[in-house]
Amino acid sequence: MVSTVVGDCSGRVYVRGNVLQHNHADDTLSIFKAKSGTESFVVKRVSRPFYDLSIRLVAEFTGSRRLRMHVDCNQDEGVLVYPYFDSTLLALIQNDPDLVHTQRKKILRYTAEAIQELYSKNWIHIDIKPDNILVNLDGGDTKEIANAVLGDFNIAYHLEDGKALRTRHAISNAMWRSPEGQTAVGVTKASDIYSFRLVCIYAIGGGELLLLEDYQDLVRFGITPEQEVLSRHFTYFGPVPDALYRRVDDEVGCALLRDMSKIADATVESQPERRFLYWSKELGPVAQDAISQMTTLDPTTRPTIEQVLAHPWWQED
């Protein structure tokens, strides 16, 4: 990709600058910050299937305030141009662990509204995680959140006739997947709801319970990320209901779930305090209720996004 890109839609010239995300296999697929006049943008060369998907999405969600869609493109080069954001939820909390609770909830509220917008046209995101939530600050010293949007639709999927998504292998980041998502079977809107609530747990201070920092140790002991995440989640949010097995309805997937359920049950027998019911008490009853609803292991009983947004937790300071 050359150092400048001309947008097909606007005719603007974007001058490529710093690398935001380096692709070691192919430098032309790296993500760059770019300038056009005094404005900052993100320039990203993408695969043809994702380019075509993005064109479809931007047509469906024109003018969205909560979804980060591209604002310009270059078809010949396969380049998309996005608005530039100051940070992500992941980086914001890592860099400022003392970010006030009300600002964290503001980001989460905006994210829930983004999910609602996707669902209104029967799309699921599949990869909801803190680094796909982009944030702008107001520029002052108070670290007020000016805006937050949901981005990165690489694996977004349009549900046809309410059918669950089934893939050849699990997709998205293992740390933020729903239990059914770990098996690559039975992924629906309810799967996104589960992932969103994991993001909420992270945002309100529970990151150490969710993040995998020891990938090399897992590999050394022959443990896959899926196994580790499932055993943790079943420990926190179990016991595993029969409804999850019915949703997955796949021999290999159900075997994985049962094996991890046995490990989780043994853990809880000796350490009952690892259940969400115990360690979430400090959140207060309203927050505890909101999170427990969305992280239920039964996909059929997770709340809709409208129910999520109507929960009293959002009105708490």
PLM region descriptions:
Residues 3-63, 68-69:
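ATP-binding glycine-rich loop module of kinase domains
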Residues 87-145, 288:
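Conserved alphaE helix
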Residues 131-175:
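Activation segment/activation loop of eukaryotic-type protein kinase catalytic domains
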Residues 184-189:
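Activation segment
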Residues 192:
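Conserved catalytic-loop aspartate of Hanks-type protein kinases
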Residues 296-301, 307-317:
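Terminal C-lobe "cap" of eukaryotic-type protein kinase domains
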